[in-house]
Amino acid sequence: MNSQSGTRNYGPDKARDFAQQLVKEANASLESNRKMWLPPQNQTPVLPIYYQYVIATSTGYEADQGVYCHHNDEHYFFVSRGRNKNNYNRSVIRKYAVGSDSILNIFIMPHHPDSIQSSNYDVTSAGIALGASVKLSGIYETGKKPWQFKGLLNHEIGHVLGLRHTWSGNDGCEDTPNHPNCWNREKTAPCDTAASNNLMDYNANQHAWTPCQVGKIQMNMANLHSLSRKLLEENWCRLDESKTIEIQDSVVWNGSKDLQGHLVIAPGAVLRVRCRLSFPIGASLIVKAGGHLILDRARLHNACGDHWNGIMVESKGRHEGQITFRGDCSVEDTIW
């Protein structure tokens, strides 16, 4: 967002370069989850984070390459504090959001020029998540590099994906302890030992996701009715045989999954499914001779409005695959 004069934010070329680099830096953080600092001497596992951002184009706006520059003196500014703050004002979103039913919109907005001139107003970076949109400020005025805002972007998108602040109250995760919300580690107490590096705190690092936070994000993405899911690229609709999963041990699946390949239960293996599973068109669930599939209040279907092959039970000599149904189960959208 920029003023009508075009002097309050980056021009088109610089804006596009900045946005692309910011997304690249934020994705790099997603690829390199770090160990939690809190609690001290913790044994919290460091899990991979299985999502990345893609700058999306919308039909009719392909030439903009997913980065749009708007000039509007009424809507371009962000006031993060004071009696005239407009953090929760959605007017800019209502006017300029593109494809908000399936695209996460990031609005980079400068502070109001009157705010900047006030000696009591700190020109700092700030952000807020509002539904499927995020408003960020302090990007242009501070003159910082894109990598310096990757934590801010990941933090606000974390809210969109269902995460809450962790330093006080209950965020729904036992592995994110409360703390005094230090900005960084210091030599004096309490910030010598109580500083956090978690994504959802206000701190100088914001590069650690806990197992619970990763799980909450994945759970929301797998929820057929969630906001998070509407923002995903549907890469589970086409069969990719390289993504075939073979179960070779005793495994229980409790959380919904959208598979991209076949599912094979090897001889001697047991898979207990207690959730929703989606299979792409052309995919099969193969129970090898000696394998055992337990459907425990499970739903097997195709989440793309199409069909999948269904369940194949193989036999070999005196051995054959087994299927056990427990509770209310459904196998839908099969061609067999």
Task: Give, region by region, the residue ranges found by the protein language model.
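Propeptide-to-catalytic entry region of secreted or membrane-anchored zinc metalloproteases
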Residues: 1-97
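Solvent-exposed, polar/charged alpha-helical surfaces in well-ordered, non-transmembrane soluble domains
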Residues: 17-24, 28, 151, 198, ...
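Sec-exported extracytoplasmic/periplasmic mature domains
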Residues: 24-35, 159-166, 222, 226
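Active-site-proximal segment of zinc-dependent metalloprotease catalytic domains
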Residues: 81-168
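The catalytic-center signature of Zn2+-dependent metalloproteases
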Residues: 134, 138-211
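Pan-zinc metallopeptidase signature
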Residues: 212-242
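Extracellular beta-helix/beta-solenoid repeat scaffolds
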Residues: 248-336
